[in-house]
Amino acid sequence: MELTDEQWAVLDPLIGGMPRRADRRGRPWRRSRAVLNGILWILRTGAPWADLPERFAPYQTCHRRYQRWVREGRFERILEALATDLKERGKLDLSECFIDGAFIAGENRGGCVGPTKRGKGTKLMAMADRFGPPLAACAASASPHESRLVAPTLDSRFVAALPQRLIGDRAYDADPLDAELAKLGVEMIAPHRRNRKRPKTQDGRPLRRYRRRWKIERLFAWLGNFRRLVVRYERYALNYLGFVQLGCILILLRQG
């Protein structure tokens, strides 16, 4: 997959150029569009960097540029710019948002790797807005319960505003979580666990919104189309998260 002219026109001013030495010595920088297309090929196929076709750029160039962009937080800034623009144009709705996590198997080393019954892995957390596009994404160890990963997920959101309502499955039925979010002005909506011992705190009225939770499942299906995200090959969690952010960028570009 390669960027269309319309998509590149949006990304070009956001991704920025690369600095040159004052004496202009050394090899010239490869064009950012060719390099980014090469990185997106890796994202889509999940192939090793060394298998990158020569029509893009040398794989060493794409790999170095990718790591540099990740360190500089460029993908994060692009997401913030795209999401803010969509929100201002009414194409993002924070009146109700959906949250969920997915277990990602991969390397038994590096950061954000933890043991579970399914083996060691990483938990990919994501939040979708009322229409379904991504609003937040973060990577964490797979060991903690998902209810403990809500705060990091909210902190990774692409816009400044908080959602009015946050909808999740039974894993998010936790009174301390409800109280913590209520202090932020966020209403947590989740079905009660079958083994819940405390009195119920929700009735059928807010739970009607739970029927639209399929939108977060659709978001994970969209992300699953990028094979580099299905299994974590990166030793460093930040490099894996960079690919997640790239996938979210492509999804947001389609909403424009």
Residue ranges and their predicted role:
Residues 1-256:
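Short alpha-helical elements
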